[in-house]
Amino acid sequence: MKKILVVGDLIADYYLWGKSERLSPEAPVPVLEVKKESKNLGGAANVANNLISLKAKVFLCGVVGDDLEGKHFISALKARNIDTSGILTDKTRCTTLKTRIIAQNQQIARVDKEIKDPLNADLRKNLLDFITEKIQEIDGVILSDYNKGVLDFELTQTIITLANKHHKLILCDPKGKDYSKYSHASLITPNRFELEHALHLKLDSHASLSKALQILKETYQIAMPLVTLSEQGIAFLEQGELVNCPTIAKEVYDVTGAGDTVIASLTLSLLESMSLKDACEFANAAAAVVVGKMGSALASLEEIALILNQTHPKILPLEKLLETLEHNQQKIVFTNGCFDLLHKGHASYLQKAKALGDILIVGLNSDASVKRLKGDKRPIVSEKDRAFLLASLSCVDYVVVFEEDTPIQLIQALKPDILVKGADYLNKEVIGSEFAKETRLMEFGEGYSTSAIIEKIKRTCND
């Protein structure tokens, strides 16, 4: 588990949800009939929350006011297992609170309560003492700057210098015009508007984007400069050349907090030794998850994997499949296998299995599972491609990949009406049969097997 220190501005996000169908008689403004209220962790706390969702250990460092919102805020952080020992109380300010008013799932107004004054000398010293104490323990640092007074120029540069001295990855989500504040950071994540504002450049072409990123690299010594481009994805430099990693999002409901998700997922990806390109693809997938939800949403590893791996709508993780089948009344048939080098025998077997019920679910052994069962030279075809081929068959309704050696957990969760296995299981125990109403054995098709196909290919190559 990676340990990440997040330093920055803490924001309480408050939402009023409802419907608006009339104007106020007092002024030409809409009247919201509130149906629901919710509170989320915002700013640097949302970055921390995203990291928790991605299975990291998080130390959060920032400031709240000496007020009820601040107390509730810290309680919410603790409930998410975020370490709050680096959060200080400032008696001279209120906890930053952003209230968003949502009507018919559209944000119609926002009300901000905040004080953006710089921290006093004592608070700055206490924050820096905490960071200095933690720096050797953690794997990376994120500076989440919302320009609310915590990350002034001097403190930001001191933290970056400290991180570099201890060879720690340090990423910054910047604000304001002066990017010298973030000089020598490992990576910064401005959006197009922020970067245009800071560099006084219009970023409307390949050449202008490349020039802007070169300035970040050469003038500000940012090791890995990039820019987020909303629906156009993320652009970065690779050996001096501009690379664009396109967005993955299909439906956008709310972009609130998407930048926090991007920097959190980039940090963890890079700490896992991913290339910058792969890290950007991972971050794009995480962002695609959160913009498809309302509010400062989170992306789980399972949801990100679904975005990255799903090349067919029939391919689902178990959690999503169970959700899809929650109110199902049709007869479910389940079978499983490696289905390496899909052949006529497989297709015939699956068609017969589907004929036994209404919905056919195929449990597919992952690459790691196949390797354990059949040896290091298998599978021939990757799990992603095997899943796609199976999902392309009209007789198959859903494909779910499992990592274990057996599908016992899938069968126990799905509780199919009929469990189908190959006829070679005659007089053998069928794993998971106790969780199905009925177990049926079925021929694959005489003369067809993946092993036979592999041997035939070998003989042909040798000839």
Curated annotation (Swiss-Prot):
**Pathway(s):** Nucleotide-sugar biosynthesis; ADP-L-glycero-beta-D-manno-heptose biosynthesis; ADP-L-glycero-beta-D-manno-heptose from D-glycero-beta-D-manno-heptose 7-phosphate: step 1/4; Nucleotide-sugar biosynthesis; ADP-L-glycero-beta-D-manno-heptose biosynthesis; ADP-L-glycero-beta-D-manno-heptose from D-glycero-beta-D-manno-heptose 7-phosphate: step 3/4
Q: Name one GO biological process term.
A: ADP-L-glycero-beta-D-manno-heptose biosynthetic process
Q: Pfam families in the record, alphabetically?
A: CTP_transf_like, PfkB
One GO molecular-function entry = heptose 7-phosphate kinase activity
What InterPro entries does the database record attribute to this sequence? Answer: Bifunc_HldE, Cyt_trans-like, PfkB_dom, RfaE_dom_I, RfaE_dom_II, Ribokinase-like, Rossmann-like_a/b/a_fold
Task: List the active-site residues.
Answer: 260
Keywords recorded for this protein, A-Z: ATP-binding, Carbohydrate metabolism, Kinase, Multifunctional enzyme, Nucleotide-binding, Nucleotidyltransferase, Transferase
Segments passing through the bilayer:
none
Q: What family does the entry list? A: In the N-terminal section; belongs to the carbohydrate kinase PfkB family. In the C-terminal section; belongs to the cytidylyltransferase family.
Q: Which NCBIfam families match?
A: cyt_tran_rel (TIGR00125), rfaE_dom_I (TIGR02198), rfaE_dom_II (TIGR02199)
UniProt function note: Catalyzes the ADP transfer from ATP to D-glycero-beta-D-manno-heptose 1-phosphate, yielding ADP-D-glycero-beta-D-manno-heptose.
Share what the entry says about its subunit structure, partners included. Answer: Homodimer.
Q: What is this protein called?
A: Bifunctional protein HldE
This protein's species is: Helicobacter pylori (strain G27)
